[in-house]
Amino acid sequence: MLKGGAPMKYQVFSDMDGVLVNFESGVLKHMNERFQEIANNQEEYKALRGSGSSDYKLYKLARAAARELGGWDVEINKWHIARSDQEGSLGRNKRIRDLMYRLVEDDVHLWANLGWERGGKELWDYIKDIPGLEILSAPMAEGSKLGKKIWVERELGLPVEKVNLSDSKKPYGVWNGKQGLLIDDRDKYVNEFREGGGI
């Protein structure tokens, strides 16, 4: 019985991406739009060569991703940006993932406006009244941190003080003298959390 009656001995944390927030759909939509925009304007991007322009660097990343995909006309899908090594995709899709990070890591607007994960609202409705509930999410760059905080304030109504953004979840396994309980979709972070004493 969690709703409204979670034992106070646990510090409960919920992840965002893949749990409450639909990272995958929003990122794929954004990536494919930008990828096609670059594909349609290659000559303009090529003209920036030697200028030190960040747009030219972006073009080079997109060009490498296009080679990896097998062409500019291939749609980037969830397997291209998979966060785990399902079907050995990490090794095959390195340039595509590099492009993803370049396009989204610092985009405040993107992070602030991602949609809900399927079942995310229902999960939130179930857990939101747990005493002391906090968000624990791994960020990318500074823009992702700000965007995540905006999303949490708007969608969840939580103050930013309840938003923990960290590359490692291990330190949160025991938090404020309580054993932590983490809701997360990624084994990497669940294992880190357990190493820190959490469940």
Segments (PLM) and residue ranges:
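Active-site neighborhood of HAD-like aspartate-dependent phosphohydrolases
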Residues: 4-103, 195
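Anion (oxyanion) recognition and catalysis
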Residues: 128, 194-197
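A short, structured active-site edge motif that brings together acidic residues
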Residues: 134-145, 149, 154-173
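Conserved Lys-Pro-Asp/Glu-containing loop-to-beta segment of HAD-superfamily phosphomonoesterases
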Residues: 163-194
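Short hydrophobic segments within beta-strands
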Residues: 15, 136-138, 183
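Short catalytic/ligand-binding loop motif for oxyanion handling, primarily in non-cytosolic enzymes
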Residues: 21-24, 28-30, 133, 142-146, ...
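A structural signal for isolated positions on well-ordered beta-strands in alpha/beta enzyme cores
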Residues: 11, 132-134, 181
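Short, acidic loop-to-helix structural element flanking the phosphoryl-transfer center
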Residues: 71, 88-135, 142-146
